[in-house]
């Protein structure tokens, strides 16, 4: 979109810095001829201007309010290198098929952000600008982070490859389950659930996001019973096992204390929740790196700002920030389960976690190429309303480098927890075997599972119980550039 000359940036210094109010594009925040530098951070915003607000002016306002501008001209601008410090909106396009919404591309000089700080970057990009009155709504859809800035972050403390080496498990997805019910179990009963799941063939068990240290179960009791279960299951199966011990707490001091105790007990992995905040996440990443412990991130709270398509932050952006911040696992959706997730969009999240270079892929919501500069890869986690009868879909969608977590799909098994774990492990092994033999598991999957169930009573019971269960709702966050195919 091009605007007439009277709306162009004012170059006369006297006029530009005269006291009063100027349009944002006149102050230099709209630069349609700007070519982003390799060292620029580029953000794609979805903006919905108020009625009567020009979309170019709205884009310029986003650039201004997320970098150096305020509502009026200030004389102290002349004490800075304004041309470097101003963010630059350089392109605006209508969102396909959605009247009143626009995509705005905004470039930020690398000098605007503190090295290795997600908190500082987000204070600019999703700070006051999201409350700006001339906008009905704004959403950060995607971000291109320059290699020069990526290199200021340490990234995942363990990474996908080293995690597999530590666990000695290759060529298949990892299996997990969340202990249920989330709240109310005693420490001893909690440990019994963990043992049964791991003994039945799961690689991991897991605390849920809201189990910390409540009156019915102190965190120290849980850790002791859980690690006793992990050690016994490892001895019984000959496999390395783990259970995500949630160290989320009210203060960093409490979190460090819990993490240290988990390490002393021999846990290979600890867990944190997204709600602890970006600074706490980076702090726990540093701890995990120093102590050779895998760091699992539950994305608790993300749906409050990622789910709505017109306002907030896309989860693909959160996934990028978390890879920089340094987590080894992150929940990324299932597409076929109970939680929000369009199949192609969710695949885009997985690409962000696992690629060395994430390529632009508009049908999957990826607007930019992203070079990760050899930053370690994150293991995506699929969790929420999945069961053994969907194994072919999950492997077809997400491949091997994923943790498939069947909480209710393990612990709700009619024959018990261990039987539920057996059902999931057999379903996984038969599907991987069929895939490796060259079979079309997407289409032949149900038949492959039925044949395997002839020799595995727990799998047969799982298919009989949940085989017809699906969550067929229209996702709210879908690609603007492709019709998403069904998951069959």
UniProtKB/Swiss-Prot annotation:
The keyword Ribosomal protein does not apply. Its EC number is 4.1.1.39. The record marks 338 as: Transition state stabilizer. The modification N6-carboxylysine is found at residue 206. Substrate binds at residues 128, 178, 182, 299, 331, 383. Its cofactor is Mg(2+). Keywords: Calvin cycle, Carbon dioxide fixation, Lyase, Magnesium, Metal-binding, Monooxygenase, Oxidoreductase, Photosynthesis. The keyword Nuclease does not apply. The active site is at residues 180, 298. Binds 1 Mg(2+) ion per subunit. One of its GO terms (biological process) is reductive pentose-phosphate cycle. Pfam families: RuBisCO_large, RuBisCO_large_N. NCBIfam families: PRK04208.1. Heterohexadecamer of 8 large chains and 8 small chains. Belongs to the RuBisCO large chain family. Type I subfamily. This is Ribulose bisphosphate carboxylase large chain 1. The gene is cbbL1.
